Regions:
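Single conserved hydrophobic/aromatic residue that forms the stacking wall/gate
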Residues: 1-13, 17
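Short, surface-exposed connector motifs at secondary-structure boundaries
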Residues: 21-26, 90
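Flexible, glycine/threonine-enriched loop-and-boundary segments that flank and lead into catalytic domains
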Residues: 27-43
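Conserved C-terminal portion of the radical SAM core fold
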Residues: 29, 51-52, 56, 70-141, ...
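Short, glycine-/Ser/Thr-/acidic-enriched flexible segments
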Residues: 31-35, 57-60, 97-98, 135-137, ...
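Flexible glycine/acidic-rich beta-alpha junction loops that bind and position SAM and/or redox cofactors
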Residues: 36-40, 61-67, 97-105, 123-152, ...
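Active-site-adjacent "gating/activation" loops or surface patches in catalytic cores
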Residues: 42-54, 58, 62
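Radical SAM enzyme core and accessory elements
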Residues: 166-290
Length: 290
């Protein structure tokens, strides 16, 4: 979150009032749980109510530590209380499934936490949309060494959540695991994927962002014709010493730092925000760095 987001919001509202453009409406996606405890909360309270998404990402504090999101359940519930007091009557929570070390307890925790958020304001439960997205390990992150869940595992986890979602206050929505598999292959692939991408296009894969037009079988044909195994790219856990297809790209953060963070994540150790704790030696220039 931008730490001074309330400044541009105030300026935007002033400009709209000055130019007689009417009331300001702002949608705030994927905010940290404590974002509304202060000036930002007071600022958005004066605006037309639109969508607000909080992103706990995981159903348990244990798994949030694994992904270095040190957000307590109580801080999330307090954020919900503040939003309800400010006038919101529905919230959206963003979660991921398929994260490293994830267990059934973590999946159950998604619905438990969402149910608590729905009732955080006291009285009648408020509507909470539970948005589920499969985790995709991305390059230049500590999880670039992790393997992605298979399509079958992801589909089973979505089915598990659907079968357990019997709270009328909750609306469960999910990202299609099939498109996530494709995203995982493309995100972690190398130059050998280029002919497969061209072949998939020739087979009709053009508007795959639209679910009604997406067909994973076209991509499977393209991968097979190119002699490629999607498991090799998406699902395989990578060795720490493996040379990655993107290693030649310098994004500033060192691979050694990412590897340390990968080890810490598996141990559930949280790395503090360098803006608070000081330079952590990631490789990017910052105040206090040597």
């Amino acid at each position: 979150d931008h730490r001074d987001l309330h400044y541009p919001l105030r300026r935007q509202r002033q400009m709209c009032i000055r130019d007689s453009l009417g009331e300001v409406s702002v949608s705030l996606p994927s905010l940290h749980a404590d974002a509304f405890a202060g000036e930002l909360g007071r600022r958005v309270a004066t605006m037309r109510k639109t969508g607000v998404t909080l992103a706990p990402e995981c159903g348990t504090e244990r798994l949030r530590r694994v992904v270095n999101k040190d957000v307590s359940e109580e801080s999330l519930l307090e954020a919900a209380r503040i939003l309800y007091k400010l006038g919101w009557r529905s919230l959206k929570l963003y979660f991921m499934i398929g994260l490293p070390t994830e267990t059934e307890e973590d999946l159950v925790g998604i619905l438990d936490l969402a149910g608590k958020v729905a009732r955080a304001g006291g009285g009648r439960p408020q509507k909470v949309t539970v948005a589920i997205s499969p985790f995709i390990p991305k390059p230049h992150t500590p999880f670039q060494w992790a393997g992605m869940n298979s399509l079958k595992k992801l589909a089973n986890k979505v089915d598990f959540l659907k079968s357990r979602s019997n709270d009328r206050a909750l609306v469960l929505k999910w990202h299609d695991p099939r498109t996530s598999v494709l995203e995982g292959v493309l995100a972690r692939g190398d130059r050998r994927l280029a002919p497969a991408v061209e072949r998939a296009y020739a087979l009709g894969s053009r508007l795959d962002a639209w679910s009604e037009l997406f067909d994973l079988d076209r991509w499977r044909i393209a991968w097979q014709e190119a002699g490629l195994d999607p498991f090799f790219y998406a699902e395989r856990e990578r060795a720490e010493g493996e040379i990655m297809p993107w290693d030649h790209i310098d994004c500033g953060v060192s691979k050694d730092f990412l590897l340390k963070e990968w080890s810490k994540s598996q141990a559930g150790e949280v790395t503090p925000d360098c803006r608070v704790a000081g330079c952590l030696g990631c490789g990017l220039p910052c105040a206090g760095a040597d």
